[in-house]
Amino acid sequence: MKQEVVPILSLSEKEKRFFETSFTWEPHSRNLHKQFHINKLEGVIEHMNFPLPPHRQTVNDFVFLTSGESIRSKGLDKYVFSSDTFFFLPAYQISTHELMSADAKGYYCHFDNEIFTCKWLKPDILAEFSFLQFTGNPLVTVEADSRKHLLTILEHLESEYSPDANYNLDVIRVNILSLLMEVKRFAKQEKVTENAALRIAQQYKNKLSRFIYEKSTVAEYASMLSVSPNHLNKCVKAATGKSAQELLSEMVLLEARVLLRQTSLTVNEIAWKIGKEDPSDFIRFFKSKTGQTPTEYRKTE
């Protein structure tokens, strides 16, 4: 059986796959690069192998355009964006990157969640930013008045990352958080009350996005979060209005849709990949959720 699936790429794997083989590129610091990286788009994008195929990555990233246009996906949704717009992608989310126009300018940045693990920051601080969540809108367009301030922050981050800099992780943390807080002002967000149920629900969503091929029951995810299945279900229900099983089914359905549209796996292989050993069970599940069989869905645009 073929093992084709949407891969989770390490940073080195991503660079090998997405840059031209003739293009030699090395980060300024391999150690820092695993936690944080930033570069201007110009001078780099012409060496990338667009379109980039479906993949996941182990870090969060964003692209900020000051000119030009780009087309990038998050899950099954495709987004076209241009100047003064950020595109944010959380770690382990499925993505493709269709194009970056030749006149595109701006910044690419990635950062690992671990960079925010320190005693003076509250746990799960990234949960405050809807655009960095699995189900959030990845696009944030900023007003012209804020553009100069945001570019100054990005320039500070670029300077801290330069080969000659004796980098300071605290400086990098503060600047990233400053940028995220500024961007948050322009993000379309629902007002959500911070509570334990919300935090557990968000942790559950993040685990689903990362381990959907490995874990197939609510009980397994509850164990990973060190809570009982009943408590997990209550938290998810309170935070989202849906049961933990419903969110699990939604994630399985998303994976199935992506695999049907963007890989050459057979229906039987996809059924096996997402934990449905009986293909007829997968077909019934898929049709109950979409109104179409997997084969019918694959044929539609």
What is each of the regions a protein language model found here?
Residues 84, 232, 281-282, 286:
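Short hydrophobic/aromatic patch on the recognition helix
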Residues 1-70, 79:
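Generic protein-terminus/edge-of-domain signal
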